[in-house]
Amino acid sequence: WYYQDYSVENQIHYINTIRSADWVYCHNVSDISYYKGLGCKDVRVMRSMMIPEGLDCQDGSLYKEGILLGGNFVSWYGGMDSYLVASDIPEKKYGVSMGRKQEQEESIEDIEYLPYLTWREWMKNIGQYKFGVHLMRTHAAGTFSMNLSFHGTPVIGYYGLDTQELLHPNTTVAVGDLRTAKFLMRKLYEDESFYKECSEETLHLFQKHYSEEAWMKDWKIRNG
């Protein structure tokens, strides 16, 4: 719903533009009813996809450490929610540098921020972290949950993102349910068997739902 931060004139222009389209592609199943409610005639899901050619899966949990936070401290990313949940366990926290990062974030002493990275640099870097937290209320492409799934890293996130729900079913919570998110954070940290279960499951689910072959199969089903 980022367009609702535009001027009123541009909001109306946006709605009229997508209403006039023959069909609209969206990221998530949960987006379909929204766009149809806006008046779009034909709405289809185009799943997010990554082609990991040349990348090594870093799925060993013994050498992993730290928590990677999925977004900055603005409402779009829900960075404060992620920070509060991650702070419930004694693991070092790492943050990402997105375009809407605030200058004051560098003053938070217990977060070490990654520099801006190319996608390939990003994918090689994130395999070292043991946990992911991305409590983003807005529905977008969900690449954070997907990228960490490739490395077998469990992610705590909100319902509404297909990548989160399909790849991390045991660590997905209702929007705003920080209590359950904190419970899961502690369980991942304290219960080795639960962590192993989530890690192995997300590796399997990545191949099932987000491999190139799975993407093509889903595309053909949705587009005939």
Please place each PLM-identified region on the residue numbering:
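Membrane-proximal helix-turn-helix segments that form the acceptor-binding/catalytic region
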Residues: Q4-V24
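Donor nucleotide-sugar binding/catalytic pocket of nucleotide-sugar-dependent glycosyltransferases
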Residues: D22-K36, C40-D56
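Conserved catalytic-core segment of nucleotide-activated headgroup transferases in glycan assembly
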Residues: I51-W119
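Conserved active-site histidine-acidic residue motif and adjacent donor-binding/catalytic loop
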Residues: I111-I126, H139-A141
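Short alpha-helical segment that forms part of, or immediately flanks, the ligand-binding pocket
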Residues: M123, S145-H151, Q164
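Acidic donor-binding loop of glycosyltransferase active sites
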Residues: G127-A140, T153
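Conserved acidic donor-binding segment of nucleotide-sugar-dependent glycosyltransferases
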Residues: P169-R179, K187-E192
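A charged, aromatic-enriched C-terminal amphipathic alpha-helix characteristic of glycosyltransferases
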Residues: E190-N223
